[in-house]
Regions:
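An aromatic- and histidine-rich active-site surface loop
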Residues: 114-127
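Short, polar loop motifs at secondary-structure junctions
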Residues: 63-69, 134-140
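Short N-terminal or domain-adjacent regulatory/targeting segments
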Residues: 1-31, 40
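Glycine-rich, highly charged phosphate/nucleotide-binding loops
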Residues: 14-18, 81-99
Length: 172
C-alpha cells in the first residue's frame, strides 16, 4: 500500500456512516441496490441492472469518474457521477456527495472497486446500507465473495445474484 493510501485509510478510520441495522437481504426481498463502479466498468453492470429490473429492484450506480468534464459518461440507467471535485486529495468524498447518496435507503451496497482503490472503499464505508458486498476482505463489508484477479465485474455481479438467492431469512 502506498503512503497516500495509508494516510487516507487513517483519515477514513475516524469516519462512520449513519447507523443502520445490519441485515443479510435475500434476493426476493431486495428493493434498492447501490453499485459503486468506476467509469470503465459501466458496461459490466448492465446485465445485473436488467436482472434487477425484471424483479422490480431499483439499482442506482455511483460512478467514480476522473476524466475530463466534457467526456463524462451518460449511462442509460439511474446513476450519480462522482468526479474529482467531489473527493479530497486523499480520495475521501466530500459531505455533499455522501449526503446525496445517503438520501436514498439502500438494502445492499456492492463495491466493484478493489482493496487499493480508496475512493470506492471510502464511499462504501460512508454510505448507509443494510448489507455491503465486495470481492475482497475488509471489515466494512458484510459479505466478501472471493474471485480471482481475472474475474471481471460482470462475472462478480452474477456471483452476487447467486449468493443473494442463497440467503435464507427466518421469520419469527
Amino acid at each position: 500500500m502506498s503512503l497516500l493510501n495509508n494516510i487516507a485509510n487513517y483519515l477514513l478510520s475516524s469516519k462512520e456512516s449513519p447507523k443502520c441495522a445490519k441485515q443479510f437481504v435475500p434476493w426476493s426481498q431486495l428493493s434498492n441496490v447501490l453499485i459503486i463502479a468506476f467509469d470503465n466498468q459501466l458496461s459490466n453492470v448492465v446485465n445485473f441492472i436488467n436482472a434487477c429490473q425484471k424483479e422490480n429492484i431499483k439499482v442506482h450506480v455511483a460512478v467514480i469518474y476522473d476524466g475530463k468534464l466534457e467526456q463524462t459518461p451518460k449511462p442509460n440507467f439511474d446513476h450519480h457521477i462522482l468526479d474529482k471535485k467531489q473527493f479530497n486529495f486523499f480520495g475521501i468524498p466530500n459531505e455533499g456527495a455522501i449526503e446525496t447518496l445517503n438520501s436514498k435507503q439502500f438494502d445492499t451496497l456492492i463495491n466493484l472497486g478493489n482493496a487499493e482503490q480508496i475512493k470506492s472503499l471510502a464511499i462504501s464505508k460512508l454510505v448507509t446500507a443494510k448489507c455491503k458486498i465486495s470481492h475482497f476482505q475488509n471489515p466494512i463489508f458484510d459479505i466478501s465473495i472471493d474471485g480471482d484477479k481475472t474475474t471481471n465485474s460482470s462475472k462478480f455481479l452474477e456471483q452476487v445474484i447467486v449468493y443473494l438467492h442463497m440467503i435464507k431469512t427466518t421469520h419469527k
